[in-house]
Swiss-Prot record:
Gene3D superfamilies noted in UniProt: Aldolase class I (3.20.20.70), Exo-inulinase, domain 1 (2.60.120.560), Glycosidases (3.20.20.80)
InterPro entries with a match to the protein in the record: Aldolase_TIM, GH59_C, GH59_cat, Glyco_hydro_59, Glyco_hydro_59_dom, Glycoside_hydrolase_SF
EC id: 3.2.1.46
Catalysis performed (reactions): a beta-D-galactosyl-(1<->1')-N-acylsphing-4-enine + H2O = an N-acylsphing-4-enine + D-galactose; beta-D-galactosyl-(1<->1)-sphing-4-enine + H2O = sphing-4-enine + D-galactose; a D-galactosylceramide + H2O = an N-acyl-sphingoid base + D-galactose
Record GO biological process: galactosylceramide catabolic process
Recorded superkingdom: Eukaryota
UniProt-recorded name of the protein: Galactocerebrosidase
Keyword rRNA-binding: no
Length: 678
């Protein structure tokens, strides 16, 4: 930790002064660089806030299944003001029924005549965010769309009025059913935009008295949207924010020339250790210093998905074990707090921001009511590498920095100090530690800055490093697990721990079945969605521990589609997320035409055995898949159907259920038994 020096001009005694000068020159050669903090020349851009994303996709899937009090604690670390990350902005995926990185999120309209504003968990998360911070800004953005939007094509813009209606219905539903006011809406995450659609979206919003909802475009690169806005006055008028992803702290000149608000509307996406914290610290400052971006939004908010899915642990914190209750408050939470706890949307950057002489950067913000916050970071190259884009080499060294307070701030006498040190060589990094107040003398103060440090210097007294008792110890997924889905009024549409990777699986009530299968788990998509990734043509939901090897998976199954329908249970499934279509494992299928097959892959191309099973649609059957070492066998309704199949594929992976295409099918009395040791 570095000392904080006041800006006194009192001359020390001769001997004392020579010793201090010698020490300073030895450790920090050169006179302290001087930096002005001044609002006399006007202010910079308005600060819009720091945010995070749930979705894109299913990144918060496991969070909803946490027990209390751990679930509330996690939400407090994310959203509660002056406690943890204290997020200003919360961006969610508008579920589109398709794979969007780590899973699928359900649409509020699976079909044209279907509207349900209680599917998934984003509604709940937005309400939890608002409960803690009523001022938090909400953003909705589609990654994918249900298939009917494209009328058979993998494209949402052939009928732009239909797409606009669909998106605006989500905004209206948020208000009508959850009393949530959506502040911003996006176009199509990291995919093509359509100028006609953007204009029609603005028209549809206004027609529905949603003039307050602002449009962000295009959630991809700066170009060509900035160029098109400069060429098209109407497009320039209807787009409120140009949002770019992973901009590397720089904005395109055309984007600046539009005069529009500029955001890093998705950034970070980095493993949440000290290097991830360093990445986040650097871009939170330098996105404005280098690129005039007034908001930076992290993908993702909380890594609450199975770690072996793509981009594991790339959230501001980690909550991937609802079965144990364990979670980890990671370094990026406290780096976020360095800015969010001492600013608010509506504050203004000063024009006096920039780079430090020996590496690093500083920003200064004010509420125009006399409050001042300065955030300083000295992240080295190797301690702040983000996932993208590549980071050019640069050097940072220890330094003194003297800040002169001028304008509205010249009479400040004392400032609060919060400090972090993220050096990867430290055995125990320091995060968000409150230091003694800094006495300002003669309008200045000097900081002795080391490498990989973050300082917040502020007039505000409200900061807090919130904490709870340690969560329970980490534990693997239980070796025995079962679910009969008998929940009359489920709080969420998905059953615990199932992570849909293609298709959508929901709790279902069979009102016409008075027997043992009134409450089931149903795959509900009947059409391939407008995809964001290379989705599988089969529906699949995974569950459990990726390290499982010797496992028995059992489920009652009900094929609803005569002749062509089919379902499976599986184990050792080795892929999820965007490459789900390439998943391998052991898949035990039965079909409505009376056949069965066992395959080594989800696509069904590697057939290990096949034959007749006598299964028909609209009748309940029980499938059991047993794998031990290199051998597998299967049971139908408790009787052997096939045996002595040599696996030959992945040695471990998740358990799974699914369907042979996008079709209605039901599952019940699901059970896993694992022989592996914990």
């Amino acid at each position: 930790m570095r000392t904080v020096l006041a800006g006194s001009r009192r001359a020390p005694g001769c001997g004392e002064g020579m010793f201090i000068l010698w020490l300073v020159l030895l450790l920090f050669p050169g006179a302290p660089a001087q930096y002005s903090v001044d609002d006399l020349g006007g202010l910079g851009r308005m600060f819009d806030g720091i945010g995070a994303i749930s979705g894109g996709g299913a990144t918060s899937r496991l969070l909803v299944n946490y027990p209390e009090p751990q679930r509330t604690e996690i939400l407090d670390y994310l959203f509660k003001p002056n406690f943890g990350a204290s997020l200003h902005i919360f961006k969610v995926e508008i579920g589109g029924d398709a794979q969007t990185t780590d899973g699928t999120e359900p649409s509020h309209m699976h079909y044209p005549d279907d509207q349900n504003y209680f599917r998934g968990y984003e509604w709940w998360l937005m309400k939890e965010a608002k409960k803690r911070n009523p001022a938090i800004k909400l953003i909705g953005l589609p990654w994918a769309f249900p298939g009917w939007i494209g009328n058979g094509k993998n494209w949402p813009y052939d009928f732009p009025d239909v797409t606009a209606y669909y998106v605006v219905s989500w905004i209206i539903g948020a208000k009508q059913y959850h009393n949530l006011d959506i502040d911003y809406i996006g176009i199509w995450n990291e995919r093509a935009y359509d100028i006609k659609y953007i204009k029609l979206l603005r028209y549809t919003l206004d027609k529905n008295n949603l003039e307050h909802v602002k449009i962000i475009a295009s959630d991809n690169l700066w170009q060509p949207i900035a160029f098109h806005m400069l060429q098209d006055p109407e497009l320039l008028r209807v787009v409120d924010v140009i949002g770019a992803h992973y901009p590397g702290t720089h904005a395109a000149q055309d984007a600046i020339l539009t005069g529009k608000t500029l955001w890093a509307s998705e950034d970070y996406s980095t493993y949440n250790d000290e290097v991830g914290g360093g990445c986040w610290a650097r871009i939170l400052n330098q996105n404005y210093v280098n690129g005039n971006m007034t908001s930076t939004i992290s993908w993702n908010m909380v890594a609450s998905y199975y770690e072996q899915l793509p981009f594991g642990l790339e959230g501001l914190m980690t909550a991937k074990e609802p079965w144990s209750g364990n979670y980890v408050v990671s370094t990026p939470i406290w780096i976020t707090a360095h800015t969010t706890q001492f600013t608010q949307p509506g504050w203004y950057y000063l024009k006096t921001v920039g780079h430090l002489d020996k590496g690093g950067s500083y920003v200064a913000l004010t509420d125009r009511l006399g409050n001042l916050t300065i955030v300083i970071e000295t992240m080295s190259h190797n301690n702040s590498i983000c996932i993208r884009p590549p980071l050019p080499d640069y050097n940072v060294s220890a330094q003194y920095a003297t800040f002169y307070l001028q304008g509205s701030f010249k009479n400040l006498q004392e400032l609060q100090v919060w400090y972090s040190s993220l050096d990867i060589n430290n055995t125990k990094p320091v995060t968000f530690k409150k230091l003694s107040p800094l006495k300002v003398q003669n309008g200045s103060f000097t900081l002795q800055l080391g490498v990989n440090e973050v300082y917040t210097i502020t007039t505000l007294l409200t900061g807090q490093k919130g904490s709870f008792p340690d969560p329970p110890e980490s534990k693997p997924f239980p070796l025995k697990y079962k679910d009969d889905f008998s929940v009359r009024n489920p709080p969420f549409s998905e059953a615990p721990y199932f992570a849909d990777q293609s298709g959508v699986f929901e709790y279902f009530t069979n009102t016409s079945d008075p027997g043992d299968h009134v409450f089931t788990f149903r795959q509900v998509l009947t059409q391939r969605p407008i995809t964001w990734a290379s989705d599988a043509n089969q529906a699949i939901s995974v569950i459990g521990n990726y390290q499982w090897s010797n496992v028995t998976v059992t489920s009652d199954i009900y094929i609803e589609t005569p002749d062509t329908g089919g379902v499976f249970v599986a184990a050792r499934v080795d892929q999820g997320g965007s490459p789900t279509d390439r998943a391998k494992g052991i898949f035990f299928w039965v079909f409505a035409d009376g056949t069965y097959k066992v395959t080594g892959d989800l696509m069904g191309q590697t057939i290990l055995c096949k034959g007749l099973a006598g299964v028909r649609a609209r009748s309940w059957h029980t499938l059991t898949l047993h794998i031990d070492g290199t051998n597998a066998f299967g049971l139908l309704n408790g009787n052997p159907l096939w045996k002595e199949v040599v696996t030959g594929g992945p040695l471990n992976g998740w358990a799974a259920i699914g369907t042979s295409c996008f079709e209605f099918a039901q599952f019940d009395n699901f059970m896993i038994e694992v022989k592996d040791s914990e």
